Amino acid sequence: SLVCCGDDPMIRDLMAPFSKKIIYYGLNANNDYQLKQLEPFENCEYEVYCEEEKYCSLKIPLPGRHNALNSLAALIASTEAGIDLETATQGIENFNGVGRRFEYKDEVDGVIFYDDYGHHPTEIKAVFNSFRDRYPGRRLVVFFEPHRYTRMKDCWEEFIKELKEPDLVFVTRIYEASETPIPGVTAEAIVASVPKAQLLDMNTKWEGEKLNPYFQQIQDEIQSNDICVTLGAGKINVIGEKLIEYLKDHA
């Protein structure tokens, strides 16, 4: 069996030639399993319907529509593999997530810090939507470390579109991951394209007091009640931890 998100027309087109059993899930009514009554906040709660009849209810300790959809896919795959519904439901409801995915880090002077591994526009969009759902009305501040010159070049317009969504974005130098720089693909170019962005002209591999001027730059901009997120696949999570230490020492 193939378990696919039927909300995406492209996936349905790709699956059309296959003769295997295909099970579609999602938010739309034309799916085999439909997710309804979604509350995508601190804990996602939702109901699952199959052929217009209620199949089960789920509550997972992870926020966001994408996590709700992922958990529904896991539930369907589990039952298709022969696991009974009650056991599958309990297992999914007890799953607490993984590191670097919407990971709570700390709170300093009313500022809440999270970390997420998101480094592709689709992931980033889902992350931002989750924070907006969980913390409506609060300022979203993002510390973004671009990852790979080629990825930034290939998805440039998509990155710029998503990075315009937060209230403030700090952009570090691009984490090269052994790639050769590409002319025009720079942190400065990102900042120039995103009105609410500031350049953190730093390398996330730096350590010690060399980081302090950039931490001071951040401290001057963030406010109590902000939601701050380190975002990227390089070393930005380590910088986030050092930033928290700095803010505690300079409160």
Where in the sequence are the language-model features?
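Structural beta-sheet core signal
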Residues: 4, 24, 141-144, 171, ...
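Acidic, Mg2+-coordinating active-site environments of NTP-dependent enzymes
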Residues: 1-113, 188-193, 197-198
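Short glycine-rich anion-binding loops that position phosphate/pyrophosphate groups of nucleotides
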Residues: 8-9, 119, 146-149, 174-177, ...
